[in-house]
Amino acid sequence: MPSNPTRKGRVVVGMSGGVDSSVTAWLLKQQGYEVVGLFMKNWEDDDDSEYCSTRQDLLDAASVADLVGVEFEYVNFAAEYKDRVFAEFLREYSAGRTPNPDVLCNAEIKFKAFLDHAMALGAEHIATGHYARVRTVETPAGPRHQLLKALDDTKDQSYFLHRLNQAQLARTLFPLGELRKTEVRRIAHEIGLHNAAKKDSTGICFIGERPFREFLNRYLPSEPGPILTPEGQRVGTHHGLSFYTLGQRKGLGVGGVKGRQRDDGTAEAWYAARKDLARNVLYVVQGHDHPWLLSAQLQAQDASWIAGEPPAAGAYGAKTRYRQVDAACRLDQAGGERFALAFEQAQWAVTPGQSAVLYDGEVCLGGGIII
């Protein structure tokens, strides 16, 4: 990379203290941008908890900014996060669905509140360490911005970014989209970043590494109820429907019930298959390929299309969960805020509250919330 690059515009980089955002800041500095690193604090509660790493992450981000030689700032979006993301998270779980707060956080915080803050700082662009790409194509109506999958398909994060719009993509840079994670780690080591080997963050940001049920218990009342088979046999008691997601295998509390057995005499695994909120019943089935776990079609609501309008009916690929291989499907209808997908092969554990994201090859078209 050039050591004396031509000066480009001002870009504010969301720096989390992790290796991806750190290398992002360094790459943009090398490319000639005036870089400002910005650490976002999105959660206030439990800062003293053994599970919370916010303080260390802030120190890591500040240290990297100093080493790279960029301005560094701190902003607290905790109030916005609770209002726009966490409140919706609780509403969805209360309704028996399994939301994906990372999708909402990207749309409402990282590419809205953060973007607005960056523009107030005089930035022309924002950048993050997400693995995705932006491409601008000319159309008769003017330039259109497309969200593309990352070059490294094992790290592609376009699924979490599918609710971004044209205005947001026009201001966004994803420097890591053309790199593989191994290259990012190599760069971090070569330039002497102290966090080069730092473990990638996992799980929901405000929960951290703490047990999920323990966290949710603080905010939602638990209402135990029966666990039934499709035939109506009671095989256990659940702790509250909010604590279970479709396809869940561990933590059901029915391990002592044999039921259906394999040829070798061992019992087939149990899976959470359906929730009956009206009766407070959790239904479980045995066997990974039980019909109750398979869906040939789905309906989605709260649709968001990157182009600003729904794609035409036809054949596409779709993901109903992160890191899933695109499933061949047909978009049968897309009008208003709803759409329907029909799959060539039935999909496993399609979960209400999760996102169904549509792709045309490497181009992410948008998506909606599964109902």
Curated annotation (Swiss-Prot):
Q: Cellular location of this protein?
A: Cytoplasm
Task: Tell me which residues bind ATP.
Answer: G14, M15, S16, G17, G18, V19, D20, S21, M40, G129
Provide any one GO MF term from the record: tRNA binding
The disulfide bonds in this chain are: C105-C205
**Keywords, ordered alphabetically:** ATP-binding, Cytoplasm, Disulfide bond, Nucleotide-binding, RNA-binding, Transferase, tRNA processing, tRNA-binding
Q: Where is the active site?
A: C105, C205
Positions of region (Interaction with target base in tRNA): 100-102
Family matches, as InterPro entries: MnmA-like, MnmA-like_C, MnmA-like_central, MnmA-like_central_sf, Rossmann-like_a/b/a_fold
**Catalyses which reaction?**
S-sulfanyl-L-cysteinyl-[protein] + uridine(34) in tRNA + AH2 + ATP = 2-thiouridine(34) in tRNA + L-cysteinyl-[protein] + A + AMP + diphosphate + H(+)
Give the main location. Answer: cytoplasm
Q: Which SUPFAM superfamilies match?
A: Adenine nucleotide alpha hydrolases-like
GO CC, sorted alphabetically, is: cytoplasm
Q: Which BP terms in the Gene Ontology apply to this protein?
A: tRNA wobble position uridine thiolation
Residues of the signal peptide: none
Tell me if Transferase is a UniProt keyword of this record.
yes
Record-stated family: Belongs to the MnmA/TRMU family.
State what protein this is by name: tRNA-specific 2-thiouridylase MnmA
Gene expressing this chain: mnmA
